[in-house]
From Swiss-Prot:
Subcellular locations according to the entry: Cell inner membrane
Residue ranges of the TM segments: 10-30, 52-72
Gene Ontology CC terms, in alphabetical order: plasma membrane; proton-transporting ATP synthase complex; proton-transporting two-sector ATPase complex, proton-transporting domain
Subunit structure: F-type ATPases have 2 components, F(1) - the catalytic core - and F(0) - the membrane proton channel. F(1) has five subunits: alpha(3), beta(3), gamma(1), delta(1), epsilon(1). F(0) has three main subunits: a(1), b(2) and c(10-14). The alpha and beta chains form an alternating ring which encloses part of the gamma chain. F(1) is attached to F(0) by a central stalk formed by the gamma and epsilon chains, while a peripheral stalk is formed by the delta and b chains.
Domain of life: Bacteria
GO MF annotation terms: lipid binding; proton-transporting ATP synthase activity, rotational mechanism
Membrane disposition: Multi-pass membrane protein
Function field: F(1)F(0) ATP synthase produces ATP from ADP in the presence of a proton or sodium gradient. F-type ATPases consist of two structural domains, F(1) containing the extramembraneous catalytic core and F(0) containing the membrane proton channel, linked together by a central stalk and a peripheral stalk. During catalysis, ATP synthesis in the catalytic domain of F(1) is coupled via a rotary mechanism of the central stalk subunits to proton translocation.
NCBIfam families attached to this UniProt entry: ATP_synt_c, PRK06876.1
Pfam families: ATP-synt_C
Keywords: ATP synthesis, Cell inner membrane, Cell membrane, CF(0), Hydrogen ion transport, Ion transport, Lipid-binding, Membrane, Transmembrane, Transmembrane helix, Transport
Protein name: ATP synthase subunit c
Family membership noted in the UniProt record: Belongs to the ATPase C chain family.
Length: 83
């Protein structure tokens, strides 16, 4: 029983940690490319900004889905039925 709970805790930590890391990398790339595009064509900056915010929202959604799955695994422990 302790092994299953321990492995579940490790899986939850990896899921949340990797989701946060991926989001941070994604936001860094997104912001950098937005600044490059706005510097190259300043007249396109408002349109690029709208698209950047849409993609930023999708990046956050992926992380929140990962957190939801992690909390589901943590509190319901679907692997507990294997015991």
């Amino acid at each position: 029983m302790e092994t299953v709970l321990g492995m579940t805790a490790i899986a939850v930590a990896l899921l949340i940690g990797m989701g946060a890391l991926g989001t941070a990398i994604g936001f860094g790339l997104l912001g950098g490319k937005f600044l490059e595009g706005a510097a190259r064509q300043p007249e396109m900056a408002p349109m690029l900004q709208v698209k950047m915010f849409i993609v930023a929202g999708l990046l956050d959604a992926v992380t929140m889905i990962g957190v939801g799955i992690a909390l589901f695994m943590l509190f319901t422990n679907p692997l507990g039925a294997m015991l």
